[in-house]
Amino acid sequence: MLVWLANFLESYVSGFGVFQYLTLRAILGVLTALGLSMVLGPWVIRKLNELQIGQAIRDDGPQSHLSKSGTPTMGGTLILFSIVTATLLWADLSNRYVLAVLFVTITFGLIGWVDDYRKVVEKNSKGLPAKWKYFWQSACGFIVAIALFVTAQTPAETTLYIPFFKNVAWQMGVLYVFVTYLMIVGFSNAVNLTDGLDGLAIMPTVMVGSALGVIAYLVGNANFSEYLHIAFVPGSGELVVYCAALAGAGLGFLWFNTYPAQVFMGDVGALALGAALGVIAVIVRHEIVFFIMSGIFVMETVSVILQVGSYKLTGRRIFRMAPLHHHFELKGWPEPRVIVRFWIITVILVLFGLATLKIR
């Protein structure tokens, strides 16, 4: 939004052209989102407490979690507000990739908000019925996937690139739509499954989102992409602003979500952030690298799939409890130890993922 204003003012007053620089707008984006989440955080927490929007805790989970009962939830609303506001202010809103990611963020946020509202306010333990949640996730996911496919301007935009190799790629064609759909919906639910401990989901989200911002900057630059032998996707660099806003909003939220948490993000935050990460990974053509960097989200999801599958087939459970973080809690690990070790794993995976850009 302010990019347009700067362009207009540049014709009358010199100096406003500086706002064309992507790096400056990314810095302003992260500072704006961080400032909003830090300043509004106490007010949001106070309002959630006044409205008695508190988290309900399962009786069959780790006993240490019972003390979390009543902790304000739906704090993801603060994250999304900060991200969207910063992006609207500092990103180029004529960029189709920015619009696609904003659409995913807002629509999946609404799905999560309805789910949280039914659970917490209406006291419906099931929240939004699973079939309707999946229906709306699928509808929104396919809308974006189809839109990106039909507006693709170069073959690179629908090609799957294999890391570690310079010239190994697969032109997906119409399968691009289904891959994009799976990335959006799959990681939306993966982040949601991971969001079970204080700060466990938001910090990996910030780290992976920041790494995607670096990749978006490189992929959107013809010189860097040619030098690194990676795909060049014109316009994708603008997503750096969104990724910066995500990092700022996430860090601001972590200030209040770190152990012991004063607020939880709820489905409104987890579903939206996971979907946003998924669609950004698709746009910058680094789906496989994204899988590597998002190893914690993948492991948490796989643990649930294995647990459910094993119980249905054999009547036995592989883990003491799924998702995986609960397994370690029931083994006697203190919650902060689980959280920090999962963060450390994410740091390693993100660094390895970024290293693949050069290892060709």
From Swiss-Prot:
Its cofactor is Mg(2+). GO terms for molecular function: metal ion binding; phospho-N-acetylmuramoyl-pentapeptide-transferase activity; UDP-N-acetylmuramoyl-L-alanyl-D-glutamyl-meso-2,6-diaminopimelyl-D-alanyl-D-alanine:undecaprenyl-phosphate transferase activity. CDD domains: GT_MraY (cd06852). It is an enzyme of class 2 (transferase). The keyword Cell division applies. One of its GO terms (biological process) is regulation of cell shape. HAMAP family: MraY. PANTHER family: PHOSPHO-N-ACETYLMURAMOYL-PENTAPEPTIDE-TRANSFERASE, PHOSPHO-N-ACETYLMURAMOYL-PENTAPEPTIDE-TRANSFERASE HOMOLOG. Belongs to the glycosyltransferase 4 family. MraY subfamily. This is Phospho-N-acetylmuramoyl-pentapeptide-transferase.
